[in-house]
Amino acid sequence: MVSPGPVFGIVLLIIARVSRSAGIGFRFASYIDNYMVLQKEPSGAVIWGFGTPGATVTVTLCQGQETIMKKVTSVKEPSNTWMVVLDPMKPGGPFEVMAQQTLGTMNFTLRVHDVLFGDVWLCSGQSNMQMTVSQIFNASKELSDTAAYQSVRIFSVSLIQSEEELDDLTEVDLSWSKPTAGNLGHGNFTYMSAVCWLFGRYLYDTLQYPIGLVSSSWGGTYIEVWSSRRTLKACGVPNTRDERVGQPEIKPMRNECNSEESSCPFRVVPSVRVTGPTRHSVLWNAMIHPLQNMTLKGVVWYQGESNADYNRDLYTCMFPELIEDWRQTFHYGSQGQTDRFFPFGFVQLSSYMLKNSSDYGFPEIRWHQTADFGHVPNPKMPNTFMAVAIDLCDRDSPFGSIHPRDKQTVAYRLHLGARAVAYGEKNLTFQGPLPKKIELLASNGLLNLTYDQEIQVQMQDNKTFEISCCSDRHCKWLPAPVNTFSTQTLILDLNACLGTVVAVRYAWTTWPCEYKQCAVYHTSSMLPAPPFIAQISHRGI
């Protein structure tokens, strides 16, 4: 016969072990933490995490001693996850979020404090998005201004890659934080994106309520690594798994390095921009998909440099498809709380290296960033906005001319687009002028461009505008100097063409102009005209 003492001791030990094991797996998702910003009304914020299968989880939102709301759910198998959607909340705070897991008589409690409600924006892309405030112009002043923006909270995802879609982040680079000179200026390409921070700061200046900024970027990366397999399949992207970094690639070369020839030999060009992972979908899997349950206001994106010489012609499909896929994923992941067609902003590529060279494919990528429309929103890219950056060159950047340091102007132009597209602000100029009519005046040897806005011609040269001149089935691009201009029209001289003019293009080079000195701007906002290319009809278009 066994004495009661040892049996009772064994029972207590078993109960203790069960109790501990029941609480070990109970946690919030990786990005639910102190100081976070949750999406405000009209959407509901999603709170989720992991727990013990079969357990009940009660999520309570409190402010001081007041209980604002309670939501009850259970831990689902086989994912061992729980999730609730909070009722829509007005902007403000701070609040506390408490989650309590109950399994039989055992309770385990988690808390996060100083939680705000506002708008949450995800920022992603490659190195120009990854650059920190310490790397930009006037860094000291920008870092000294953080005290005024304690309601703009920041979060940064670690550099992680995965062959499969992850449900949660495996690492966090910077957990939700109030901005400081330390975490904004932590070093080069670490912690927090300068473009993201400045964009959020400009939004806060306008909206005057909390902004949450989530940075998930990796320098030197193709769009393919940020795209799901669904996106790549939809665009017929070859399923390459090449891990080479910085290896020479074969690409066509302009004959004698000029842009006038239509056929070119091939040469080997070192791909100096590719320093990140190259395996398709690995960053989508590890750095974007784990965020899918987060309720978002929108996304801003700065990427494309690496695709200037890699799958360039597929970019016009991949970028709109990426936007559509991200929208669908975040909508369903957030239980329908993130808008199905949430606003998506992006930066059109700036300049790189050699002046007046189109050898790096930048003009084509800029065009493909708009799905070959030249402007956004457009039928293939609804509810999008773009910051044109062709005039923000920086040949003296210590990080290379591909990394211009004026991120303030980039972010300001982005925030104008957000105010117009995401927030519906009326009568706000948020993009530069584009031709709405192109008329060939053949008898006078002139081409008349009528713009959709008032224009200011900042500079006249014989290189910015070009015409495609065809003779005997051979076409080449020739300069078309500005003849005259007025408030909304600009006339080009076609005398250089002795054949038939079939197309016109503007700013179609890697380096279109010097800093803020491109040819055409909007008169009052001084937003630059974006690059364009258009076929010419003899009856006008």
Curated annotation (Swiss-Prot):
Keyword tags: Cytoplasm, Disulfide bond, Glycoprotein, Hydrolase, Lysosome, Serine esterase, Signal
GO MF entry, a single one: sialate 9-O-acetylesterase activity
Activity regulation (record text): Inhibited by diisopropyl fluorophosphate and diethyl-P-nitrophenyl phosphate.
GO biological process, one term: regulation of immune system process
Annotated disulfide bonds: none
A GO cellular-component term linked to this record: lysosome
Record PTM text: The two subunits are derived from a single precursor by proteolytic cleavage.
Full protein name: Sialate O-acetylesterase
Source species taxonomy: Eukaryota, Metazoa, Chordata, Craniata, Vertebrata
